[in-house]
């Protein structure tokens, strides 16, 4: 069982709501993935008109909603988005995203840390999306973040765990859950993330852009379970040399 803040999760696969061809595919894929936490952009919500309103069907599935501040370029905009999400959704959970560069969408570490400190002081359950920087993740933990969400590779790139050496350090050092977010493009990559000891992964593009999002959601659910089970079982040591599994010459002495 995974616990973040005051909430426990059975599934360690978190999903997103963007890039799906339609809401029907999105809801079906989320259901197939068994995900219990779904992130959605605050900028997408419009409770006054009901336009593009995906809240009701998501709430009917009883998944935990994690609003994110995607689109925020600085501390001020991120805090405004967090306040708006609390007013609209009645939740103090927030996925903190600040990326001023629209081309590469790299998270701004300085603005993210500053915003995280303020939001934690205001009583939010903060899950910051950051580069795979062990020092930054430690600082975010120190200011009160409930989890850290280091990237595997750029958002939506499907490049996998390009930052694996740094993810290993973060997982080793962290005293809060580590959720690997961004860049996971295949179920095998999600398995690898869990084998490293990550507490969960967040996957959106790889599922949403699949030819069959429902089947892909199911594949990711199985992949995450497999990776977690392998981590618990304990992977064998990696060696630079060969190690025989049976005697090579014993029969020659008979």
Swiss-Prot record:
Heme among keywords: no
First-tier enzyme category under EC: transferase
GO terms assigned for molecular function: thiazole synthase activity
Transmembrane spans: none
InterPro entries named in the record: Aldolase_TIM (IPR013785), Thiazole_synthase_ThiG (IPR033983), ThiG (IPR008867)
Binding site for 1-deoxy-D-xylulose 5-phosphate: 156, 182-183, 204-205
Active site (UniProt): 95
Similarity comment text for this entry: Belongs to the ThiG family.
Protein name: Thiazole synthase
